[in-house]
């Protein structure tokens, strides 16, 4: 299936997504087409760790508009949940309904061109997951288009679990000392907090590309 070709890691967790796919930075940049955004599509995803941010641009705004690529929950172009912010070309409503358990909360579309092997990616919100929930993959469907193969990934809201005693609560990835990605796995019990200090990571792992995974536990 098309989805399996993009399988890599959990996109964003705890108020963002558990979609297993590659982001722009993990694919060869030459494989990605930043096409003009569809109406109501997310143009960028921003993650924040302490005061650092990482921006993943998904498409280009048309009609003379620009995608706001900086963290600002009050710009009228954003949906903000915890350390994640999604940007839109046009002013967006902050009053999206809260998702029900059975509702399709978010959709991703991937359009792979058979000749060029280029991929177009678009993200759409239908509703927002409640607090302490995340977006969980539940369905994939494929459609043949005149110019390639279209895969639609659908997600629902799932409640995040409380961390067990020795469980990793989050993973933070850096490259050359700069923040790239945060993946929250569970929430800490009681008065404990998930460590954010990279110098106090409970474990680290260095990837072949020089990226460093910092694994944190509750303290």
From Swiss-Prot:
Any one GO molecular-function label of the UniProt entry: potassium channel regulator activity
Proregion residues excised on maturation: 17-25
Record keywords: Cleavage on pair of basic residues, Disulfide bond, Ion channel impairing toxin, Potassium channel impairing toxin, Secreted, Signal, Toxin, Voltage-gated potassium channel impairing toxin
Name the UniProt record assigns to this protein: Kappa-scoloptoxin(11)-Ss1a
Family classification: Belongs to the scoloptoxin-11 family.
Function: Voltage-gated potassium channel inhibitor.
Subcellular location: Secreted
Modifications the protein undergoes after translation, according to the UniProt entry: Contains 8 disulfide bonds.
Signal sequence interval, chain numbering: 1-16
Gene Ontology CC: extracellular region
Expression (tissue specificity): Expressed by the venom gland.
Primary subcellular site in the record, as a coarse category: secreted
Classification via Gene3D superfamilies: 2.20.20.160
